[in-house]
Amino acid sequence: MSQIKPSRLSSSAEIRGARQLDVLQRHKLAEPQQDWLAEEVPVALVYNGISHVVMMATPKDLAAFALGFSLSEGIISSPQDIYAIEMTPGCNGIEVNIELSSRRFAGLKERRRAMAGRTGCGVCGIEQLDDIFRPITPLPFTQAFNLEHLDTALAQLKQVQPVGQLTGCTHAAAWINPEGELLGGCEDVGRHVALDKLLGIRAKQPWQQGAVLVSSRASYEMVQKTAMCGAEILFAVSAATTLAVEVAERCNLTLVGFSKPGRATVYTHPQRIK
């Protein structure tokens, strides 16, 4: 399997997922200048030779994305269910070829859907309403987080957004320990993809105690993906939706929105929060 490592800040010359284009600024319309833009390409996840989903994504940390998506969608239950991940760049996008165990591939074929996604859209292509909600085993109550450490984590979030710092165009997802230290994270133009990348990285790291921190709002699917991978606490910089709160309540996930310096709104299961 491709090696998966936590993202860290790099110099602009080393950054993948962004490139420079000529642009015109309002105050200098006659003088083209170069500016950084985030890359967005179609990424096809292909399981044992069968294309399962196409998502628009930033072309970095794609092995982590493949693993995290497979876990958060319930296609696999552990990284050991994937034997190999290989990237195949093409003219129109990137194929991520994933070799599944025969048992997991048989299960996937039963529920396979063809889904062409817009940026981070996780519902596109689902054929029936009942397919939106996946059964999630209620989470245990083994985690705790002191909000005094939240500001520390927020101050570090841009460390995993080198493309975002250049372009202002990416979402971030990070794993923070109970002391507020950012252990690693990912970025992407799509918030769901950024989260899947993080969940893929976490699956290969000894990160148990802590929480997920995302730079976006908390939709139902962000909650569902987090819970599917066993994380008990989700901090979102923006608000949560009503459906996200309902799903979090049902699966015992602690959901916190408006996670900003000096501020936090706890929606569900506050017993984990100090």
From Swiss-Prot:
It comes from the Bacteria. Keywords: Cytoplasm, Molybdenum cofactor biosynthesis. The keyword Cytoplasm applies. GO terms for molecular function: sulfur carrier activity; sulfurtransferase activity. One of its GO terms (biological process) is Mo-molybdopterin cofactor biosynthetic process. The active site is at C121. Required for formate dehydrogenase (FDH) activity. Acts as a sulfur carrier protein that transfers sulfur from IscS to the molybdenum cofactor prior to its insertion into FDH. HAMAP family: FdhD (MF_00187). This is Sulfur carrier protein FdhD. It comes from Yersinia pseudotuberculosis serotype IB (strain PB1/+). The gene is fdhD.
